[in-house]
A protein has these predicted regions:
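Conserved small/polar residues in nucleotide/adenosyl-binding loops
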Residues: 1-2, 190-194
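Active-site-proximal alpha-helical scaffold in enzymes
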Residues: 3, 7, 25, 32-38, ...
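Short, well-ordered beta-to-alpha junction loops that form the rim of enzyme active sites
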Residues: 3, 94-97, 169-172
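Active-site-adjacent elements of ketosynthase-type condensing enzymes
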Residues: 4-15, 101-102, 148, 175
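Condensing-enzyme catalytic core mediating Claisen C-C bond formation in acyl metabolism
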Residues: 11-76, 81-84, 114, 118-126, ...
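Long, repeat-rich segments with strong aromatic
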Residues: 79-86, 91-105
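Short glycine/threonine-rich loop-to-helix capping motif typified by GTGT followed
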Residues: 97-112, 177-184
Length: 194
């Protein structure tokens, strides 16, 4: 699966290209959660739907920069919708912005008057150990956010270490054909408040 994803949306592994530091690695993980009526410590208390934001970026090796504006827009909208400050969350967790996208996100939110640097984590940065693994900007793909949510974030809510998180899985709408024709990569995602 990993090789297929790399071939479809980046470069075939056999091509041997050099990855730029902004590139991320496709996570071939998964996660599943079941919603039910039974009361538990973990619950969804609200949601803010994200929207497509297209800054016209065309670098398929820098997905974090492509997705950061959409993450910024939804986080800011959530804070307005629920009349909250970043400090009202134990963690604000994005899906797969990685190192580069995180820096852009923090800068964009500061321009809107929000500093989330203390609360922010990114699944793409949490899933790999950069000291032991050469993973560039971090992990990417829907498996990244899903596996970190299921195996790392939800247990912290369940055991009471955290009371409230803002989970913002990020994603890029990609077409290898339109990208090769010179179109930009648009971004869309949604999130859940837990």
């Amino acid at each position: 699966m990993y090789k297929r994803q790399e071939k479809e949306f980046r470069f075939p592994l056999a091509y041997g290209n050099q990855r730029p530091p902004s590139a991320s690695w496709t996570v071939t993980g998964s996660g599943a959660c079941v919603l039910g009526k039974t009361r538990s410590r973990v619950k969804i208390t609200g949601a803010t739907t994200g929207k497509i934001i297209d800054y016209g970026l065309k670098d398929n090796q820098n997905m974090g920069a492509c997705m950061a504006p959409a993450a910024c827009d939804t986080i800011a909208q959530n804070l307005v919708d629920f009349n909250r400050e970043p400090a009202n969350y134990d963690r604000i967790v994005t899906g797969d912005l990685g190192v580069v996208g995180r820096e852009i996100l923090l800068e964009l939110l500061k321009k809107k008057g929000y500093d989330i640097s203390e609360q922010h984590s990114d699944c793409g940065m949490l899933i790999f150990d950069p000291a032991k693994q050469d993973t560039g900007a971090g992990g990417s793909g829907c498996g990244c956010a899903a596996s970190v949510l299921a195996e790392y974030l939800l247990p912290k809510l369940e055991n009471g270490e955290w009371k409230r998180i803002l989970f913002v899985p990020t994603g890029a709408l990609m077409s290898k054909v339109s990208f090769q024709e010179g179109s930009s990569r648009a971004v869309s995602y949604t999130h859940l408040t837990l």
